[in-house]
């Protein structure tokens, strides 16, 4: 397993010196300054590679080349944006970068309601509160027919949340949901958000699948020609929200993706925190079923609460994810690949660490403070080493 670290570029509060000291050898990054849909020029890619190389690091995984909303809705200039995506893939491959993580979530990327959830030990975590989200949909956004997505009890609790909330609480919740979290390339005002939602009025799960299939049939052949691996990130949370369909949430979705364009270059990012929110997702089974297609891993854990649709980010070895079993399955796949002649380790990054210790007094990107991720990477590294010594000595 290759130890990597997500870095948001020159403005990231976590420096590349910090990344190197954490023990990572690879960096997961993107050219966030290039507008969605535009081609990533070779010169800009090489410029970023040079910055990393100066610190003894390599650009291991692109996360992400954003998929333009026109592509997801199959409207507007979608053909132009697809052609640009194809060229960006070619340019990355020209520079020796062979793995691209992306997602196909409508409008929003990953979604949370609380970015400073207090843990019992005093650290802060990210949280998705189903009731707060219902309050946003029903009483702030006022999405038509949203009531159908919530039980009568949830609607009552959401009304109480809204009635008890201050103006500051409402503004903060709204900002957390629609203003854009780290990695998201777009933020919205409420009116802009309502307009975006309206664009999906006639797009159900089957139509979104058709739109994604069109995209994949256009870009996977380019990836094959370039030797580049695509790794789709799952929906976060892995279920429909805001009346929007989600199509990368379950093992059935993974099977559909595999069959739609059956190519080793059409692969997956195994994000244990995203998939793991659903109790019916067996993470080890997913890795075993699609091991040859898993090109990148995000290792973190989440913990479901009394309302199973509410969850918070747990410690990396805690929560509802059996991280030891997950790492075991990844190492088993690495060993299989090694026997087949593929010596490349599967890159992993510690995802969404708690804000703790000295980082509590710093301005950080939510979920991406240094110390919490350092702790997570050290813990996963320990699990990996123990398993290698006990079960996979040839991987040492």
UniProtKB/Swiss-Prot annotation:
Its EC number is 4.2.1.8. Gene3D superfamilies: Divalent-metal-dependent TIM barrel enzymes. It is an enzyme of class 4 (lyase). It catalyses: D-mannonate = 2-dehydro-3-deoxy-D-gluconate + H2O. Keywords: Iron, Lyase, Manganese. Its cofactor is Fe(2+); Mn(2+). Pfam families: UxuA (PF03786). InterPro entries: Man_deHydtase, Xyl_isomerase-like_sf. Pathway: Carbohydrate metabolism; pentose and glucuronate interconversion. The keyword Transmembrane helix does not apply. It comes from Enterobacter sp. (strain 638). Catalyzes the dehydration of D-mannonate. The keyword Manganese applies. One of its GO terms (biological process) is D-glucuronate catabolic process. Belongs to the mannonate dehydratase family. HAMAP family: UxuA. This is Mannonate dehydratase. GO terms for molecular function: ferrous iron binding; manganese ion binding; mannonate dehydratase activity.
């Amino acid at each position: 397993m290759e130890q990597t670290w997500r870095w948001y570029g020159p403005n990231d509060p976590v420096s590349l010196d910090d990344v190197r000291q954490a023990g990572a050898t690879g960096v997961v990054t993107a050219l966030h300054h290039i507008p969605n849909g535009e081609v990533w020029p070779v010169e800009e890619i090489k410029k970023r590679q040079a910055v990393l190389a100066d610190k003894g690091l390599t650009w291991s995984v692109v996360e992400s080349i954003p998929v333009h909303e026109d592509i997801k809705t199959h409207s507007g200039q979608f053909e132009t944006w697809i052609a640009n995506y194809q060229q960006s893939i070619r340019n990355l491959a020209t520079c020796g970068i062979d793995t691209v993580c992306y997602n196909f979530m409508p409008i929003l990327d990953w979604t949370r309601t609380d970015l400073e959830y207090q843990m019992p030990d005093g650290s802060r975590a990210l949280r998705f509160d189903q009731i707060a989200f219902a309050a946003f949909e029903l009483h702030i956004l006022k999405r038509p027919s949203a009531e159908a997505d919530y039980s009568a009890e949830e609607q009552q609790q959401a009304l109480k949340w809204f009635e008890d909330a201050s103006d500051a609480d409402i503004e903060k919740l709204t900002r957390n949901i629609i203003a854009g979290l780290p990695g998201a390339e777009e933020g919205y005002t409420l009116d802009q958000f309502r307009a975006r939602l309206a664009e999906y009025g006639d797009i159900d799960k089957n139509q979104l699948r058709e739109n994604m299939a069109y995209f994949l049939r256009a870009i996977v052949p380019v990836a094959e020609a370039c030797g580049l691996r695509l790794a789709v990130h799952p929906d976060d949370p892995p279920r429909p929200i805001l009346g929007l369909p989600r199509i990368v949430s379950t093992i059935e979705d993974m099977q559909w993706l595999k069959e739609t364009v059956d190519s080793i270059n059409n692969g997956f990012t195994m994000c244990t925190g995203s998939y793991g929110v659903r109790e019916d997702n067996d993470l080890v089974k997913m890795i075993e079923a699609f091991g040859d297609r898993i090109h990148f891993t995000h290792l973190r854990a989440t913990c479901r609460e009394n309302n199973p649709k509410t969850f918070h980010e747990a410690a990396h070895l805690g929560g509802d994810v059996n991280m030891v079993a997950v790492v075991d399955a990844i190492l088993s796949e690495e060993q299989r690949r090694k026997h087949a002649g593929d010596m490349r380790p599967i890159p992993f990054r510690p995802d969404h660490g708690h804000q703790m210790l000295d980082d509590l007094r710093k301005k950080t990107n939510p979920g991406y403070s240094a110390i919490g991720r350092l702790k997570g990477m050290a813990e996963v590294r320990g699990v990996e080493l123990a398993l290698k010594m006990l079960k996979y000595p040839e991987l040492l």
